[in-house]
Amino acid sequence: MSSLASQLQSINEKTASVALDRKQRSKLHSRSLIFDPKQAATQDYEYIYEIATEGLEDLCELDSRFNKFKSTLFSETSVNLDRNLQTKDVISQLDKNIDAFLTLVGPYYGLTSSLKAVEWLVRRFHANIHNAELMILTALPYFQHPVFVKVLNVIPKQNLPQIFEWLVGYKDQLKTPPASSILKAFRNDFHFFNFYSKFLNDQIKNHTVYKEQLVFYLSNTVQLLASFSKNIEELNETHIPVVLETTALMLLPQQKPKYSSSINSDLKLTSYSIISVLSSIFPFSADILKSLTVSILEDEDALKGFTKPTLIVLSQLWKHFQGNLEVIEAFKNFKIGQHELGVLDELKNENYQLSTFIILVFISTFPSNESYKLLPFIDLSNKTVFEIITKLVLQNSTTQEDSIRSNLTKIAQSLTKSDPKLFQTTLESENWKVDELELKLMSVLVESKNDEAEFDAGDEDNAVEDIEIVKTVDFTKLQSTAKSYFNTEYDEEFNLVLKELKSVLSASDAKLHVSVILTFLQKVFSTPEVALTFAFRVALTPAVPLSIRLSAIKSIRIKIKNAANGKTDFYLLIPLILLALFDNSKLIRSGFAQLLRLVIEIKTKLTTGAALFLEREIYGSVSDKKYPTPHDSLFLCSLLSEDNVKDTVLDPSRVINILFDSIFKAKNGKSKPGKYFRSFIFTQWSLCSLPIVLKANAWKIVAQANKAGTDDRFFFLDGDIENYFSKRNVWIDQASIAGIAFFDNAEVSVVGLVGGVASNDKNSNTESEWLCRALENPSGNLQMTANNRVLETFDTFKPIESRLKIVNKLVDILINDDIVEFDPMATLQELNIDRNLFLQALTSVQIGDQIPEQGIAKRRRRSSNSTKQAMVRDEINNMASGHLKKLTFLLEILESSLRKKRNVAGPDLLKVLFKILTDLEYLGNDGNLPVLYAQETLASCMLLNIVNLKSSSKEVKFDSNSIRADLIVNSIRASPSPQVQNRLLLVISELASLAPEVILHSVMPIFTFMGAHTVRQDDEFSSSALQQTVAKVIPALASNGLSPVNNEIEFLLASFATAFPHVPRHRRVKLFVSLTKTLGCAESMHLILFLMGQQYANNVHKNKNGDSQSVVEFVHGYMKSFSAEEQLAGIVAFTKLWNDIPLNQLEPGSEEFEVLNNRPVFGTTIATLGQSGLAVLRNDLLQFLDETLSSENKHELSSLKTKMALVLIDDEDSEVSKKESVLDKFRAITSFALASLDTFTNSHADIKLCSTLYSLLGNLLDLLPLNYFIDSIVASLDVDTLSDSLSIKVARNYAILASRKFETELNVAHCDQVVIESVINNLLPILIKGIKKNVDVELQQAYLDTFSTIVNKFGASGTEFASSDVSKVLIESLGIVTTDRGLLNEQPEVIIASINAITSIVNILGVKTLGLFPKVVPPALKIWESTNSLGDKESAKLLQGSVLVLLSCYIKKIPAFMSTTLEAVLLTILSSDLIDNHIRSSVLDLIVDHMDLAQVLKSLCNVWLTKKFYTNDNSGNIGLFLKTLQATINKMEKKQATTQATLFMRWLISAFEFRQYSEDNDNKFDNNTIHRLESSFHGCAIAFVMKLNDKSFRPLFANLVRWAVDGEGATLKTNEVSRLLAFFRFFNKLQDELKSIITSYFSYLLDPTSALLKRFSEGSLVATNLRRIILIGLTSSFKYDQDDYWSQQGRFDSICSPLLSQLSNIEDSIGKYLVKSVSTFVTDVSSDEYNETLVHELIKYISNANENSAATKIWSIRTLKTIFQKMGEQWLSYLPTLVPYIAELLEDDDEEVEMEVRRGLVRVIENVLGEPLDRYLS
């Protein structure tokens, strides 16, 4: 930008808020954030200030920093402060204050208070102009909120900062920009991103940043960085430095008072997010990584309040680090606590890649505690990482700090477990050996090393007891006081001495270790015996490095050799050496094998009387030492042969075989010293004082031997086992120090010593008690181990008391809800508990034994007031509750055992269970305890017990005194749980077949309960229980020989039927079907139907229509499940029950009353009904049966009708008997119906019942296939047999049924020939005969309807009905129907039926019926005319419909012969007001489709003109007429249209006069109706014109013009305006349709139009609507002019002046039409000559010389504006001519004229001109 331009811009910015005129000032002042511009323009500063201070006060409450603005921006003096009058310094300070306020108000833009405050800055200080940039920056995070639009709106477009130019479009549209636009702006303009980043940096520094701003920056920055992921170079050069600068500011530790904790958190999380994204896109250098890490960890809150985000960002940051894995200074002080470890574990589970970050922290913090804690998170499968860690361990192995050495040991052990080979390889590469490292770390790293190596005792000879290196050690502090290290009393001293020994050895050469140890032993220990116990224990301690242990063994050998003086016997060491031979290390075993050989060798050379070495050190003060004799000890040594010793070296388990198979079973001649050897060895092993290193192997050896069961375990029973719980913690500590896996090894072995086969019951009881204690021990490991031992040894406990203790303990653990590591219930279910044990356990928890049993005769549960009172007492209640819990668990276990079909079931168990059932009822009722689950489990146990008993082959005998069905019934009734009830019902069902005599006496209560409760349950279990109970109890009753089984069934079904409303709907059918199949269809279906009928009758009586319908639906679904024969049999039996209902009221006490009363299916309710009640019941039951038969979908495969058809149609011989059975049952039902009709028509007249019987009879006959049906009704239809009203009614019903059956069922295309012949030969003649005789009106109607149905059905298929014989019969029948027996009858019903019959015949025979045409159509039309005077509108409607159907039939079949009556037919159809329009429309469509269209058009026009159909009062009828006319025109040929053109034009003129006709008749139709009809008129006319050519249409159009102008050919007296309106409406539509084709037709209109326009301008004619339509017509003509029609001079002259003259007095409402017409005209005739004329014509109407009105000027100005818009530069040449007049208009007195010119015309001209018009105007 040039210097001059920049100066001008600066001046412009400074003076942007300076307004030199009132309008500009008003405009500036009207810009507001909260007010409408018009409202804002009127407000003064005092009002605005008042509102602003309210907002400021609210903001001050939220943030005290706003208070400082009260004395500056919002001081009272600011009201009168005009920034345009201030000095430069004042303005500078003002801008700083405004900027400070805007940055501070950013977080509160969503509040109304902030807008009120900022409003003051905008209105008073014009911040929207001078501080626009900052306003947008602070509001930008709210770009999706309306407040952002408000901010943009108040900033003038010219003052919008250039960097925000991309917002112009959104500002203009007042829309919020989408997020994509914001991102696009950042993406495309780095300077904008840099600008915003620097603004954010200032916000951070000034502590004014807020959450929305951070979210906005983060979302856009992340997306921006991602978009440059493929252009790293550009990203690195431009964006990354900017982003890193901002991120660094965010990471700086913030001052607490300046920021809230939430903003501090947001800053940190924002920076973390950006760093994470950057690190994934851009590979940072090591320096940047370190710098960012330092920045992150510099804040002390990073690993406190933001642990997880900090760890995530650090892991993401270092994830792609490719440099060397070395110490990072930033990580040196990295502190890892439990919280951080927990977070790391969480991140690891969430699959974060932590490996690089963790290994760097590990290396940087090594070898501190932090490094060891990180080891689980390091991927040791990475070879590089593995080697680095190994080398670090080696480098730090010489440390003297115990804590560091401990960490190094743990790390090294982890490495060896992870990859032993790689660990070994790495050590070798660094010239290290495992033994050396173990010595340095003074701990064992590899448990089994080089098992193939052999123990080398060669260096023993070179060992000395005094070497130089040891002399540097101060032994005065290490003097031992222990008497023996075989005693745990001296464990602490042993550990201290051992630690010092390892320290000495680690500093010495490995080759000198034996000498060092010997010297150490000599210096530290007072006696060689104590020294030997120390060395022995060191050699057996796994925590000691292997090399030291081997050296210790060598030292022991040297010491023994030195002590072997021929008088010392060392055989007491043999048991300890045997323990050592069980060691896991082969080298250790090999060393002790050498030691054993040495002892044996010394023993064999000894003489008698030798002293026992280490006796006191081993046994201490123990008196009973169990030594073998010297002779036996020598024999023992001989048993330990060289082969045995070698075996133990190779396989330590061989020790067990040598002990138990060789030594303990040894025989020496006749003596058996083996038992002494056993005592000797086990006495020593079981010494309580021995340390864990010895005990562990002893326990393990005996435990393994005890797997097969051995009494040797009892050596440990009184000592180790009995004291285990008290000494366990001590042993755990010892094992930990000694390096023994206590929980997985030692404790398992101890528990393995307990249990197994035992010869002593006392010991078994002791062991079971010990296991019980172990099961409830707080230690989870001991619990699990003891639980496993119980599962292993439970069956080996012979005493039932021992097993019962264990069972009870496990149940107690369950009851007490103790937290244990195993599942006691799973254990109990897995244990093999036999029946006796169950009986013992259940007996021990039975409740109520203290309450005496009542006598058998009473058969009631134990319950009394005293027991209730007793249960109230808390102590008893608590005891009962505990027993209940225990009982419940035992029952669950029993249920599990019974399900597994273990040998548990038995009658004695069932007896106990029954006793428990009584007790539970007592607890539930009297104690109010929750017994439902226990009862349910008990019921399951009882059920399973009975089922298992039934499946066994043994004979079962029950004690009827203890196993009683009444107890079960009582429990069923008392229990509120459906599950308990159902299971007990199943118990009864199983008992019924196993022991029917037990339950037979309780059948009635059982059935009553099932009916009252079980059937109501909505679950599969209840349904199954119910069905099983019925299925098993009823057969048991029958097989037991009880006579009144039927009564039982009736009682059962009556109970169920009573509960029917409460049975879930979806279960009803399944329930009753299963009952029926269980009880037998013949014995139960009719009962169910009858009982359901009573339910139906009861619901009908109570007006419960929904319930009665649901009964019918149920029975319908129920019947589907049975065959046709079964269903019919059930209905027959139902009718018999119906017949048992008495006709008259019964006398109470009579025999008939008693019989009925005693039957459950009738009961007292029916027996006591009065006569009227009985009549209602009979009718309702039949109605029920009738509805059931009629409600089904008879075409379903499962319907009775289909099933009957399948039986009756099947011709196979095997089905003959079934067919006869079905027909016999059907005849029985129809006979019942006819007999009942006779009874209740004659003997006991009941009209309502007879009506139901007729319906029932019809539905019954409807079930038959057609051929059977026809044969069954023909005789009843013969009029000769109709002797009384009953037979007539039967015949009528049969005829109606036949009609319905033929209509719905007959498919002639697939009809059987037998049916067709039966219809033609039997049914039709009978019907025609009946029609001819006309016996009864209703019967006549039925016969005619049936006749028409048959003819329609069979005639449509073209079968035998097309034959001449049948045709002849039909023609004869047509002759009968057209007489007074049909068409000429007086009854509407008969007339309608006869018309249907005629229609059916005409449909088939067509032209063959022409001879009877005069007897049909004219009478039909007369019948139609008679409907207008008929009082019964419904009959009239039916008659009209029937006539229309008849006419449509004739139109289709013989259309040519309908021409003569076409006008009458059309008038009939169009005037049938009672018939729906769509029906009449379809009939009219038939006329259009089937008849000559020219004739149809002619008839339609004649109906309108001559019949004056337009006078019809129904606009719908006229619409129907027009629709038909339109359809006719659309379908007819052009030739046909031309022939009828004159007549059609007459119709069209009449149609155009329709509006006048309506107005003349008191506005017969409303305006909308008229418009709708006129639209149809125009549609018909245009469609017709389309059929004509120019030659044929022009004269017609001329006639139409003459009618419009002069009224020539008018049929009504119409005024000029009305005609012209009608014509021009039509003509305008015609122009829109034909466009330029019809432009030339305007010649017929030119003069009349010109004359009309002149009359309008002169004011002699006032018709605004007509004027508007003419202008629209002219506009269309100008627009569609393609042949310069209007450019012809004469036409131009004719229309130009009249058209422009309309400007003089045009109405405001239609001015726009004139402007459009003139501008279109100018565009159409554009030429220099015509334009000049038009300009001068238009000047007349804007010039003051002609005294034009303001309205004239305004419309002229608008016209000129539109012309310039359309013509553009073509009219610029006339600008000099127009300028004076424009200038004149700009100074017009009328302000509206001035504004119209200034805002409209001048702006348009300037746009076209491209420069201001001021130069021309001046």
UniProtKB/Swiss-Prot annotation:
InterPro entries: ARM-like, ARM-type_fold, BP28_C_dom, HEAT_type_2, HEAT_Utp10/HEAT1, U3snoRNP10_N, UTP10. The chain crosses the membrane at residues 568-588. Gene3D superfamilies: Leucine-rich Repeat Variant. Its main location: nucleus. Belongs to the HEATR1/UTP10 family. Component of the ribosomal small subunit (SSU) processome. This is U3 small nucleolar RNA-associated protein 10.
